[in-house]
Amino acid sequence: MRTLSDAFIPELPGYYKGKVRENYDLADGRRIIIATDRLSAFDIILTSIPFKGEILTQTARYWFEETADICPNHVLEYPDPNVVVGTRLDILPVEIVVRGYLAGTTSTSILTRYRRGEREMYGMRLPDGLRDNEKLAAPVITPTSKAADGGHDEPLSRAEILAQGLLTQAQWDTVSDYALKLFARGQARAAERGLILADTKYEFGTDKNGTIILADEIHTPDSSRYWIAASYEQALASGTRPDSFDKDFIRSWVAARCDPYKDPIPRIPDEIVEQASRIYAQAYEAITGKAFVPDLSGDTVLDRIRSNLVRFF
């Protein structure tokens, strides 16, 4: 399978490897961000999915353009389908997660905690009697800490964020306002295409002037939970998961076979990986309304990326 599992390019400076993306900091304040095909879930790398990095980059590109009127973003240019060059930012130490439904499979999701009997979480109280995947009265922000690689994200409340000095009051007011407006735009656009944007996460940073800027990715199948709207009511009534366009497909496959936070992860079969690749492509098409045509130039994905980044060497 044609995948990009690693994207180390020794000619580029300032290398940093994240869970999914590999970054290079240029001397002039720009950052080159390469989206690999690695699939991260449960705070680990599960496998690599063909064309995933290209799909994530192009989906985020669509959404950055669709939301540029709401808040500034880090994008400067796209020299390759897997690559964005952006303004280097100081990333704020809080991930801003917005949820419109009682859903999720991770340890920090409100559904997981709700099933354990918790009602007080993230500085809010949820009512009794909610069903799995039920729509909330209004979208809520459920922030988490940004764990170092290998660590686990931890739930935070607004009060804890301010008390710990992770964000100032002004920063919190700005990112929470941006996040809710971005989510509303995402839900509206998704609904036009027969999709439900159930939840998503945003990452913000500050530039050299202290301006808060949207970074990383936005409304991609990795950072978001998308459901097919036509499947929702029946799934809610039957207590099953709505048909989805996101990495919940593999997360659910893994979670059905082990406790991913404690047990060894079973090998994910090739047919599951290939199905996941098709789901990512279908997600791109459903979200953007455009056909996904992968760029197959170059002997390998990394060869193509290298040739497109030569001017940065």
From Swiss-Prot:
It catalyses: 5-amino-1-(5-phospho-D-ribosyl)imidazole-4-carboxylate + L-aspartate + ATP = (2S)-2-[5-amino-1-(5-phospho-beta-D-ribosyl)imidazole-4-carboxamido]succinate + ADP + phosphate + 2 H(+). Keywords: ATP-binding, Ligase, Nucleotide-binding, Purine biosynthesis. Its EC number is 6.3.2.6. Pathway: Purine metabolism; IMP biosynthesis via de novo pathway; 5-amino-1-(5-phospho-D-ribosyl)imidazole-4-carboxamide from 5-amino-1-(5-phospho-D-ribosyl)imidazole-4-carboxylate: step 1/2. GO terms for molecular function: ATP binding; phosphoribosylaminoimidazolesuccinocarboxamide synthase activity. It is an enzyme of class 6 (ligase). One of its GO terms (cellular component) is cytoplasm. GO terms for biological process: 'de novo' IMP biosynthetic process. Belongs to the SAICAR synthetase family. NCBIfam families: PRK12607.1, PRK13961.1. This is Putative phosphoribosylaminoimidazole-succinocarboxamide synthase 2. The gene is purC2.
